[in-house]
């Protein structure tokens, strides 16, 4: 308001206008501070991935598997459901990861195979969370009472929820990601689109591995691509089924993030396989007294190009030489359980890993 306009106002109105103009800068500062406070309050207590990023949670289910992927558009895939019982502990931890990611339902749940530490949590999960579809490799193939029981419990739990049987070469529709099934029911993909098979020099010294008759070698495994970022999760695939993926030619190529096969058991993680995929970072979803075998740990630790090997638990049945440094372990011996790793990936291939126990994040720049 100009001075000549002020003189046209009645005296009382003119005094109010002058006071308002004198205090206007302070009012503007107050509004700015309020806006900043509201913005901070809205995000306090949440660590959702920034827009345009892929989030991957390696949830602590005590040596089982539950891995949550959330796309930039909040589409979701849960790989496996952890154990049954324990007062719904594993379903609680899955729900906590979902809350952190800002989602309330699961679009897809992939069951890699029908062992209790992977499929056992399904009944608890469906009681709490809406699931769009379940995916698995088909009928249980293992001749054991416990696995037959767990498979039957899974089929009963999913009820009328859509179920899709996946085969090598199938894709899982997650907008923004390319999610391809590499292995399922003992079969493997013949070629990965966009990957040129290369001869694998590590095959020459790899022993022959016998095939076991459990559900493990029938694991449904996936390769997830988000721009240049590549994540590999093959469930509990064992050595005899790892080798055809990389020998004589490497069909997979290199990966940025490797969820260590079979929780780090030495029945899996053959040297020719691990060295061929050349992981930049590996996460071992072992338990305190489950897996984390010294031989498997050493193979992954020594793989060419590896920068860090994270562990969900200290492997208490191993020795200090075959455990990662404490900052790379989510749950330490003698400490509280339930801590997890959260990976946030960008389409340019860069990513970070956050240890929820420490709150510390390590960045892995584009290379």
Where do the language-model regions lie?
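Intrinsically disordered, low-complexity regulatory regions of eukaryotic regulatory proteins
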Residues: 2-3, 30, 324
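Bacterial N-terminal signal peptides
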Residues: 26-41
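Non-globular, low-confidence helical/coil segments that flank catalytic cores
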Residues: 44-367
């Amino acid at each position: 308001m100009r001075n000549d306009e002020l003189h046209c106002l009645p005296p009382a109105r003119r005094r109010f206008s002058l006071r308002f103009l004198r205090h206007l800068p302070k009012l503007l500062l107050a509004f700015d501070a309020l806006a900043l406070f509201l913005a901070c309050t809205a995000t306090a207590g949440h660590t959702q991935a920034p827009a345009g990023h892929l989030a991957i949670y390696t949830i602590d289910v005590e040596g089982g598997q539950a891995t949550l992927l959330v796309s930039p558009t909040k589409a979701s895939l849960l790989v496996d459901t952890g154990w049954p019982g324990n007062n719904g502990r594993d379903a609680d931890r899955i729900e906590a990861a979902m809350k952190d990611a800002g989602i309330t339902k699961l679009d897809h749940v992939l069951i890699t195979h029908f062992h209790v530490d992977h499929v056992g949590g399904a009944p608890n999960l469906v009681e709490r969370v809406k699931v769009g579809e379940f995916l698995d490799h088909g009928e249980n193939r293992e001749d054991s009472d416990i696995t037959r029981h767990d498979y039957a419990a899974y089929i009963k739990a999913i009820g009328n929820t859509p179920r899709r049987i996946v085969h090598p070469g199938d894709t899982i529709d997650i907008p923004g990601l390319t999610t391809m099934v590499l292995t399922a029911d003992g079969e493997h993909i013949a070629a990965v689109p966009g990957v040129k098979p290369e001869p694998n020099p590590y095959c020459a010294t790899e022993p022959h591995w016998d095939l076991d008759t459990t559900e493990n070698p029938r694991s449904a495994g996936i390769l997830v691509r988000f721009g240049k970022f590549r994540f590999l999760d093959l469930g509990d695939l064992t050595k005899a089924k790892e080798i055809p993926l990389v020998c004589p030619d490497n069909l997979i190529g290199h990966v940025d993030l490797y969820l260590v096969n079979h929780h780090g058991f030495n029945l899996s993680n053959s040297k020719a396989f691990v060295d061929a995929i050349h992981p930049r970072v590996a996460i071992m979803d072992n338990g305190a007294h489950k897996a984390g075998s010294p031989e498997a740990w050493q193979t992954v630790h020594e793989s060419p190009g590896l920068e860090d090997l994270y562990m969900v638990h200290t492997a208490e049945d191993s020795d200090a030489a075959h455990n990662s440094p404490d900052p790379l372990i989510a749950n330490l011996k003698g400490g509280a359980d339930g801590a997890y790793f959260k990976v946030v990936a960008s389409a340019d291939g860069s990513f970070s890993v956050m240890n929820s126990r420490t709150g510390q994040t390590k960045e892995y720049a584009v290379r």
